From Swiss-Prot:
Keywords: DNA-binding, Host nucleus, Oncogene. The gene is GAG. This is p135Gag-Myb-Ets-transforming protein. GO terms for molecular function: DNA-binding transcription factor activity, RNA polymerase II-specific; sequence-specific DNA binding. DNA-binding protein that specifically recognizes the sequence 5'-YAAC[GT]G-3'. The Myb-Ets protein induces predominantly erythroblastosis in chicken and transforms avian erythroblasts and immature myelomonocytic cells in culture. It appears that the Ets domain is responsible for the effects on erythroid cells and that the Myb domain encodes the myeloid-transforming capacity.
Amino acid sequence: NSTMRRKVEQEGYLQESSKAGLPSATTGFQKSSHLMAFAHNPPAGPLPGAGQAPLGSDYPYYHIAEPQNVPGQIPYPVALHVNIVNVPQPAAAAIQRHYNDEDPEKEKRIKELELLLMSTENELKGQQALPTQNHTANYPGWHSTTVADNTMTSGDNAPVSCLGEHHHCTPSPPVDHGTSEMMSYYMDTTIGSTGPYPLARPGVMQGASSCCEDPWMPCRLQSACCPPRSCCPPWDEAAIQEVPTGLEHYSTDMECADVPLLTPSSKEMMSQALKATFSGFAKEQQRLGIPKDPQQWTETHVRDWVMWAVNEFSLKGVDFQKFCMNGAALCALGKECFLELAPDFVGDILWEHLEILQKEEAKPYPANGVNAAYPESRYTSDYFISYGIEHAQCVPPSEFSEPSFITESYQTLHPISSEELLSLKYENDYPSVILRDPVQTDSLQTDYFTIKQEVVTPDNMCMGRVSRGKLGGQDSFESIESYDSCDRLTQSWSSQSSFQSLQRVPSYDSFDSEDYPAALPNHKPKGTFKDYVRDRADMNKDKPVIPAAALAGYTGSGPIQLWQFLLELLTDKSCQSFISWTGDGWEFKLSDPDEVARRWGKRKNKPKMDYEKLSRGLRYYYDKNVIHKTAGKRYVYRFVCDLQSLLGYTPEEHSSASGLTSSMACSSF
């Protein structure tokens, strides 16, 4: 604006209206006068002078008449009146000129100035007009419109302009869209101000032509009709500063993102991908000098390992303070305790890597001076207590870490094949521990620890014995008993089994190979389960026909699994009120699924177990072809595996046994 004003002054066309002190010269012209190439009728009164404030307003007022290309012959100007009173924003100069046929040179120069004005407004086109709320009762301002041909609506009855914003914005002044329609704006001096701000109440004429014919028109109208910045309420001005980017629709909390549930197939794929990724830890071990055996890790090594995993997999929410322990203590935690150190799924990744490292280190290898027939084995988190399997194993005393208690049952540590389990004798007078001939140790050092062998009987299935001493004699035994006694195992095969606190819940947050086998046992045990339970004299006759713990021992699956637990309930007469056979093969129905879930949670020591989590465990068996859901029936499932070959009796025999006492059922089989 300053540049244009100087240009106008240099050309001699800038004249202050206050110097004349007289009404505008426009009163002498009627049909031949033009306002910046707009045909118009003259205003009824003079424009406000530069030294006087506009009537009815507390703010200085400025008037703008915009240029418009109008086809046809235009008379030459005779005078140019410019009225500028305070310029609070761009393009706020009021230029009024009148034409006659005397000075064509001035007309040419004025057109050049118009082009300069248009180019300046083009640069300011990107600036948005300040939006204001349409409070017509508080803003005096543009009031009336005079239309020469009297064919258009004017004054207070004029509709709101269609240019600019549609909602809560400053309306734009009317635009002449044809040569036959003439219009001008002027200040209404007959209405006083009742508020502190100018009122924006424009008239609009709607011609037949489009309102977008002149590409410069929206920009000029916004520049001309926007009130000063000080007129805008503070909340509108704050809203102008906010530019929508679209990012506000996206959540920035990545930790709250839903994580898809793991399925058997997805877990297998994830395990394969993790194994390939874990291979990169070997370079980190060489760089930091971390031993390959996790048992030998120090606290620093454990911290470096966790740090590597966090960076490698972009893990979040890991509390490094919980991992302030050495490798031996870390490996001795067991999976359940280990998973409590890290958030969901994060602990699974760390545990998977730790297990891989332990399995790689636990691979047998020939020792110097030792016959390859007697491989040496390192101690790991399960201490590899061996029961009646192959030869005795030797470990150096420096690597021996004697546990204070055994936290897992015998079968959890070492799943034994059914051939070996069924080949054992169960006479009560059979010795619980059989020491084999000591290994010839001519070339071995004398200070070694040995793990003795024992044949497992029902009376000592939960008991492990570690012999400590020197090879070749002078053996001393230190018995380490698990928290469950053998009496409890033999006395209760139902829901109060000794395996109670050792099982894991088949919920969506933990898919464990122990709880969820790939299928039923790959090997076929010698004999059927019917023969297996018949030979067990210690079976409680008042308990279910198929105790889950006995079935787990028969199949060698380790911890009790959900399908085994369901079979136990289905053969227990006291449970027929909430789970029973339907009579159609191996199909069964959960009459009270909540009660089944409660008992499963009690068996697994998971008080928060409900049917939703139980059903997730059942769905796991769908892909394994163990249990399927019966379509169209609620809470009805079917065993699709070959239970008849496994158990030794038909579905009809099984269904009939449900209505008999346990002793009668056992005798009938």
